[in-house]
Amino acid sequence: MTHAIVLIEAEPAALPTLGGALADLDGVAEAYSVTGDWDFVVIVRVPDVDGVAEVVRNRVAQLDGIRRTHTMLAFEAFSRHDLESLFSIGT
């Protein structure tokens, strides 16, 4: 599984509806509205790097209101949530 973090700058008028539209895209596991230089952070989870390109270029970037994106591929995940699920004994 390939994970990518996508930072998104949006048109101000698109902010109220873009989060839901991003979350509904196939390949998008999570979408967050954030503070700072970017408006949204999207977590993409797909089988391979080609899938990341498909999601970012052909789905995310095609939504109305997207100004620009910045994509980072994850090398490793160190999420506490992931570790807890690995060692869970079902309680």
Show where each model-derived region lies.
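A compositional/biophysical signature of low hydrophobicity enriched in polar/charged and small residues
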Residues: 1-91
